Amino acid sequence: MAKILIVDDSKTSRRFLKDMLASAGHEVVAEALNGQEGIDKYFEYMPDLVTMDITMPGKDGITALTEIIERDSKAKIIMVTAAGQKSNMIEALKRGASDFIQKPFEANIIIDVIKKVLEE
């Protein structure tokens, strides 16, 4: 299945996503705690897909998304965040996010979205 990078400052969220993705047959190749670390690990591991939080210390998810897309326009990045204001969703999609999921969510939702994004 897919090689995935998780970018989220919440240890609980990273663990939840990692367990859920593993149970669906995906491999989490790396985890990052903030946007800059996410950018660095993206270009180190070149994953098939990234799940990215928006609100993180240091470089936020929207900035990291923008920097990754500028360097790799084919990057598949799903924003997975509690910061679910419509303005965040619109901004992320305008800057190249593949999709947007608001926390909390059910496991089947993210698995279905990942499948859809990978097939695009």
What name fits each language-model region?
Residues 34-37, 60-63:
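Acidic catalytic/metal-coordinating carboxylates
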Residues 45-51:
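Active-site beta3 strand of CheY-like receiver
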Residues 105-114:
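C-terminal output helix
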Residues 56:
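Receiver (REC) domain active-site loop signature in two-component systems and cognate sites
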Residues 83-84:
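Short, conserved "switch-loop" micro-motifs in signal-transduction and mechanochemical regulators
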Residues 11-30:
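Two-component/phosphorelay signaling modules centered on CheY-like receiver
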